Design a protein with these regions (language model features):
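Acidic/His/Gly-enriched intrinsically disordered linker/tail segments
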Residues: 71-79, 98-103, 108-111, 115-230
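Juxtacatalytic substrate-recognition/specificity segment
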Residues: 1-108, 115-122, 140-141, 156-158, ...
Length: 230
């Protein structure tokens, strides 16, 4: 645990330490146990510090982000991620325990799956599966209008409401796959669509979900309608 932000960050790191065990359990239940346990966590004291520790880039991409899992380098052939860490933004100190657990579980999944995830993996799917691991299966709101396409990386690119809805749609899709085909199939789909040397999305949908893009979209829409009606 690395404290870069003083007393408040120390309190946050203590809360992370108190909740890391349940996060490990949640990730293992979905992903398995073949991933490193030397978990590095960094708590930052300013937004600029967070952006630097998170890897830099345009400041807008870090707006509304509570934490991020990053690595300095990944060696896919050896399944090793070098310099892995979970970095918390300064605003994370004010999160409730339930919110902190969701963020911690989400980022720990990325940490666990990093060495098996391609650099060019569809981000929306990596985020949707991470949210499946992290978020409780709460009832869905009424979804209107129904999505006319699967989620995309562009849905997650813009800060604010668009990003929030993009994450929700990606999560709903991951829940749909797990609910209709089982969590093991969702894991297999992640590996097929996001793993090193992954297939393109239509091929992964065909090979793992046994459908085509139009069919899986129609099935997802029907699932969303059923869930919203509950």
């Amino acid at each position: 645990m690395t404290n870069l932000g003083g007393r408040q960050s120390e309190v946050l790191l203590n809360r992370v330490a108190a909740n890391i065990g349940q996060a490990v359990d949640a990730v293992e239940a979905f992903w398995g146990t073949d991933w490193p346990r030397d978990i590095a966590v960094v708590a930052t004291g300013s937004q600029r510090q967070f952006e630097t520790e998170a890897g830099g880039g345009p400041a807008a991409q870090w707006t509304d982000i509570a934490a991020v899992a990053v690595a300095d380098r990944v060696d896919p052939a050896r399944r090793i991620a070098i310099g892995q860490r979970i970095v918390f933004a300064p605003g994370a100190v004010s999160m409730s325990t339930s919110a902190l657990r969701i963020v911690l579980n989400h980022e720990l999944f990325h940490y666990a799956a990093r060495a098996d995830t391609a650099v060019d993996a569809p981000r929306w799917l990596t985020e949707g599966v991470a949210d499946y691991v992290a978020r409780p299966a709460t009832p869905l709101p009424e979804v209107t209008p129904l999505p006319t396409a699967l989620p995309s990386d562009a849905d997650l690119a813009a800060p604010g409401l668009q990003r929030s809805l993009g994450y929700d749609r990606a999560w709903w899709f991951a829940r749909f796959v797990a609910d209709t085909r089982g969590s093991a199939t969702l894991r297999a789909f992640y590996r097929a669509a996001c793993g090193v040397g992954h297939a393109d999305l239509p091929t992964a949908v065909h090979n793992v979900l046994g459908s085509d893009m139009a069919g899986v979209l129609a099935d997802w829409q029907q699932w969303l309608t059923r869930q919203s009606a509950r």
